[in-house]
Amino acid sequence: MGFVKVVKNKAYFKRYQVKFRRRREGKTDYYARKRLVIQDKNKYNTPKYRMIVRVTNRDIICQIAYARIEGDMIVCAAYAHELPKYGVKVGLTNYAAAYCTGLLLARRLLNKFGLDKVYEGQVEVTGDEYNVESVDGEPGAFTCYLDAGLTRTTTGNKVFGALKGAVDGGLSIPHSTKRFPGYDSESKEFNPEVHRKHIFAQNIAEYMRLLMEEDEDAYKKQFSQYIKNGVAADQLEDIYKKAHAGIRENPVHEKKPKKEVKKKRWNRAKLSLEQKKDRVAQKKASFLRAQEKADS
């Protein structure tokens, strides 16, 4: 069949059906969402949990959610902007920060359900493949599925850094090593040492050293926030190690105290009857004084 030109006549517009709003806005991939949301028919009311990862210009958002007719229900959330509390003050959108955010989400969720002591995950970070297994006589491992949204799932993407952090934190998420940094598509081999370097930001440390030697002005421009916070290339690994330990020690979110808003009044308050009478008396007295001055 050859190419058929679409004739946009009255019948075309009469029968035209618009796509879903979030598809029109380019926010939701409904083909993927349908498969992530629909639960097995023999599991009845059991929610199908998703680990949602979104990377913005200044933040990394990680959430555990499940779908309901009225909308998605968020069970737990963690953000990269919480990392300064654990000592990571700069580079809040790199691979190492994504790993920390995923780890924070996992530890916070397990703490919420009282499973943090049962499923501790992988405490020593090696970068190698690790899968959580259910413990006999205890509740099963918390299972969820990665929701990367419209992100291109290329090898080394930050989304997989958050995934690795969550798995090392004790969540059971189906995955393989094919999308982690260190996987070679030609030889089909995975090098966990390369992955470990990315988790501890050693790829950034190497680039910092290289740029400092070659072009100091470019280094000062690109790593201005690192210089401002006194973060050197040699300190990065220790910073992230301390952050991982701090997250495991206390993953609980601290609520900020609510600020009392002082109400501002933009119009004048109504006068009482006494005030109105007094105002009239003052105006009358002022008018009479002015008259007397004019006469004299």
From Swiss-Prot:
Question: Which BP terms does GO give this entry?
Answer: ribosomal large subunit assembly; translation
Q: Where is the signal peptide?
A: none
Please indicate if the UniProt record lists Ribosomal protein as a keyword: yes
Q: Where is the composition biased (Basic and acidic residues)?
A: 271-281
User: GO MF annotations for this entry?
Assistant: 5S rRNA binding; structural constituent of ribosome
Ordered alphabetically, the record's keywords are:
Cytoplasm, Nucleus, Ribonucleoprotein, Ribosomal protein, RNA-binding, rRNA-binding
Q: Name one Pfam family in it.
A: Ribosomal_L18_c
Q: Which cysteines are joined by disulfide bonds?
A: none
* Region entry Disordered, spans: 251-296
Any GO CC annotation of this UniProt entry: nucleolus
**UniProt subcellular location:** Cytoplasm; Nucleus, Nucleolus
Q: Mark out the compositionally biased spans (Basic residues).
A: 255-268
The domain of life for this entry's organism is: Eukaryota
Q: Which HAMAP family match?
A: Ribosomal_uL18_A
Q: Which family does it belong to?
A: Belongs to the universal ribosomal protein uL18 family.
The record's note on quaternary structure and interaction partners says: Component of the large ribosomal subunit (LSU). Part of a LSU subcomplex, the 5S RNP which is composed of the 5S RNA, RPL5 and RPL11.
As for what it does, the entry says: Component of the ribosome, a large ribonucleoprotein complex responsible for the synthesis of proteins in the cell. The small ribosomal subunit (SSU) binds messenger RNAs (mRNAs) and translates the encoded message by selecting cognate aminoacyl-transfer RNA (tRNA) molecules. The large subunit (LSU) contains the ribosomal catalytic site termed the peptidyl transferase center (PTC), which catalyzes the formation of peptide bonds, thereby polymerizing the amino acids delivered by tRNAs into a polypeptide chain.
Protein name listed in UniProt = Large ribosomal subunit protein uL18B
Organism of origin is Xenopus laevis
